[in-house]
Amino acid sequence: MKIFLDTANLEEIKKGVEWGIVDGVTTNPTLISKEGAEFKQRVKEICDLVKGPVSAEVVSLDYEGMVREARELAQISEYVVIKIPMTPDGIKAVKTLSAEGIKTNVTLVFSPAQAILAAKAGATYVSPFVGRMDDLSNDGMRMLGEIVEIYNNYGFETEIIAASIRHPMHVVEAALMGVDIVTIPFAVLERLFKHPMTDLGIERFMEDWKKYLENLKK
C-alpha cells in the first residue's frame, strides 16, 4: 500500500520524505490557501520534494474550464495529477484528459456507483471520502470495501485512494481491504508510529543500558 500525505505544508512533506515512507501528496485550494502560498508555485515546490504523484485540484466546475486548468497545471511537472470533482462535466473532462495522457484523480466520491463512473472514464485515481461518509452514516469503510470488490471484479486499472482518513484504524482497515493508497494528514502519519508498548519497551531498554554502564564503572 502506498502512503500519500494530504497537506500543502512543506515542512510536513520534508519530514515524511526523510522518513522514506511517503509516496505522494494530495492537495486542494483550501490546504494551499491555509499556507498563504501561491497555488502553482506551491504545487511545483511539492513536486520537487516528493518526486511522486502530487494531486492538484481544478477550481472550475464546467467542462471547458476544468480541461483548460488541467492542461495548465499539467505543465508544472510530470508528477502533477489533476483532481477533478465527481460531476457529469468532471467525468467528461476526465475522459478527455485521460485520452491526452494527463493523469487524473476523481475526488469527492461517496458511493460505489460514482467510483464505477470514474473508472469507466479512465481516471488514474479515485478518491472515496471515508471520514466524511462516516459523519453521515458510519458506512465509510463499507463503501470503500465495495469499491475494492467491484474494481477487482472487473480489473479496473484506476487506483483507489482512501481519502478523508481520520485515524490509524482507518489506515489499517483500508490496508486489510487491499486499497492501493491512503492519503492522510501529517498528524495521522505521526500516530502510526505510536504504541504504548513500544514506548514502554524503549524506556526499559534505556534503563537496563544505564544500569549496565553504571556497573562497568564499579
From Swiss-Prot:
Q: What is its EC number?
A: 2.2.1.2
Q: What is its main location?
A: cytoplasm
Q: Which reaction does it catalyse?
A: D-sedoheptulose 7-phosphate + D-glyceraldehyde 3-phosphate = D-erythrose 4-phosphate + beta-D-fructose 6-phosphate
The residues annotated as the active site are K83
Sorted alphabetically, which InterPro entries does this protein's record hold?
Answer: Aldolase_TIM (IPR013785), TAL/FSA (IPR001585), Transaldolase_3B (IPR022999), Transaldolase_3B/F6P_aldolase (IPR004731), Transaldolase_AS (IPR018225), TSA/FSA_arc/bac (IPR033919)
Q: Which UniProt keywords apply?
A: Cytoplasm, Pentose shunt, Schiff base, Transferase
Give, as in the UniProt entry, the pathway in which the protein acts.
Carbohydrate degradation; pentose phosphate pathway; D-glyceraldehyde 3-phosphate and beta-D-fructose 6-phosphate from D-ribose 5-phosphate and D-xylulose 5-phosphate (non-oxidative stage): step 2/3
Where does the record place it? Cytoplasm
Example GO molecular function: transaldolase activity
Q: Name one GO biological process term.
A: carbohydrate metabolic process
Q: Name one GO cellular component term.
A: cytoplasm
Query: Which intervals of the chain form a coiled coil?
Result: none
What Pfam families does this protein map onto? TAL_FSA
- List, alphabetically, the PANTHER family matched: FRUCTOSE-6-PHOSPHATE ALDOLASE 1-RELATED, TRANSALDOLASE
Q: What is the stated purpose of this protein?
A: Transaldolase is important for the balance of metabolites in the pentose-phosphate pathway.
The text of the family note is: Belongs to the transaldolase family. Type 3B subfamily.
The protein's name in its UniProt record = Probable transaldolase
Name the source organism: Thermotoga sp. (strain RQ2)
Q: What is the lineage of its organism?
A: Bacteria, Thermotogati, Thermotogota, Thermotogae, Thermotogales
Gene designation: tal
